[in-house]
From Swiss-Prot:
Binding site for Zn(2+): C19, C22, C41, C44
Note on cofactor: Might bind 1 zinc ion.
Inducing factors: Expressed equally in exponential and stationary phase in rich medium (at protein level).
Protein name per its UniProtKB record: Putative zinc-binding protein YnfU
Keyword Zinc-finger: no
Presence of keyword Zinc: yes
Cofactor: Zn(2+)
Organism: Escherichia coli (strain K12)
The entry's keywords: Metal-binding, Zinc
Taxonomic lineage: Bacteria, Pseudomonadati, Pseudomonadota, Gammaproteobacteria, Enterobacterales
Other facts: Encoded in the Qin prophage.
């Protein structure tokens, strides 16, 4: 039986997203951003969701 490659580990890198509240950039996991999960800004501690059309 052959082992499967762990393809998820290759996609788990950081991308920069700007907060809509304070406009500061912060790094978040690519998989989290791609799923449309809620993100927390480390600068102003506000919760936001990225617009995938703007990132792509």
């Amino acid at each position: 039986m052959s082992e499967r490659k762990n393809s998820k580990s290759r996609r788990n890198y950081l991308v920069k997203c700007s907060c809509p509240n304070c406009t500061q950039e912060s790094e978040h996991s690519f998989s989290r951003v791609q799923k449309g999960a809620l993100l927390i800004c480390p600068h102003c501690n506000k919760v936001f969701q990225t617009n995938l059309k703007a990132v792509a």
